[in-house]
Amino acid sequence: MYTNIMVAVDGSASSRQALDEGLKMARLHRARLFAVFVVDKSILLSYAGRLDPNALIEEVRHDGVAVLRDAERTIAHAGVNGDTEIVETELGQDVAERLQHYVAEHAIDLAVLGTHGRRGIRRAMLGSVAERFLRTSICPVLLVRGDDATRAAVAAA
């Protein structure tokens, strides 16, 4: 049923769980998995004048390389055919839009995202990204709640 599966990764526990679920789906459907890390330039450029935006972008790219190395090891260990890629937002584009563009570029037929990403300047906020992505998605979406979200929901019940 699925041939190309995209998983958005940012190094958070939620995105690692999304990768695990994406790998299960890829094995089940013998699909190719694409792990994607997005550098959100728009958030980083808002610090211009106080911090060097180019240095911040390079730092996020460096983080992306580390996150994707881990994803590559996980994909290889699972025995799934997969690729990893760092992509960057364009001026005026948010992370959800960039992921939608990636979906169209790579004929993705299932997108997998964690519901809670890393917070702060060194990450692209996947929690709100997941919601925006879901609203505009051109393909089926699997949202994966992280352990922290599950624990909080159970504690609140």
Predicted segments with their positions:
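Small/aliphatic-rich secondary-structure junction motif
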Residues: 3-52, 74-83, 149, 156-157
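Residue-level recognition of beta-strand->loop/alpha-helix junctions
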Residues: 37, 86-88, 145
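Short, hinge-like loop/turn segments at secondary-structure boundaries
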Residues: 50-54, 101-103, 129-130
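A short acidic, glycine-rich active-site loop
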Residues: 53-66
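Structural beta-alpha unit
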Residues: 73-111, 149-151, 157
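Glycine-rich, Arg-bearing micro-motifs that act as flexible, cationic patches
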Residues: 110-132, 150-154
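Short, structured coil segments at secondary-structure junctions
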Residues: 129, 137-138
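Short, flexible loop segments at boundaries between secondary-structure elements
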Residues: 141-151
